[in-house]
Regions:
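Short, surface-exposed ligand-recognition loops at beta-strand->loop->(often short) alpha-helix junctions
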Residues: 11-23
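Short hydrophobic/aromatic beta-strand micro-patches
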Residues: 11, 57-59
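A short, glycine/Asx- and small/polar-enriched loop/turn
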Residues: 50-54
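Long, low-complexity, Ser/Thr/Gly/Pro-rich intrinsically disordered segments that act as flexible linkers
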Residues: 93-107
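Active-site-flanking beta-strand signature of metal-NTP-handling nucleotidyl enzymes
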Residues: 3-11
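Intrinsic disorder/low-complexity detector
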Residues: 1-3, 91, 101
Length: 107
């Protein structure tokens, strides 16, 4: 059974401190864990105040658990949209790249 890993490369918004970036990443991590993600992994690339970046990974146990998370969104998109609207009012990180990977164990 394939595990699903959503991966985003994030760049800081000009003028945002590392502390502000970390605070936002903690909010995102808390949100995705509450939504049912198996785990969230955050990796820092370079120094956050000197053109650094972040890798933000949302891990799902299986395709079914990833699908359940997507179904949750479509059942009540307003709750998700409200959270995103809050984050957009104080932009801290820009998503430079995003991908969904399927980790297949039987190959």
């Amino acid at each position: 059974m394939a595990r699903i890993i959503e991966t985003a490369i994030l760049n800081p918004v000009e003028g945002k401190t590392r502390a502000q970036q970390v605070a936002r990443l903690k909010e995102w991590k808390k949100h995705w864990l509450a939504e049912g993600a198996d785990k969230v992994v955050v990796k820092e690339l370079g120094a956050g105040n000197i053109g650094g970046a972040w890798i933000f990974e949302i891990h799902h146990k299986s395709g079914a658990s990833y699908g359940a998370l997507i179904d949750t969104y479509y059942k009540n998109p307003k709750s998700y949209d409200d959270v995103v609207a809050k984050w957009q009012k104080t932009p801290t990180l820009n998503i430079a790249s995003y991908a969904v990977a399927f980790e297949v164990e039987d190959i």
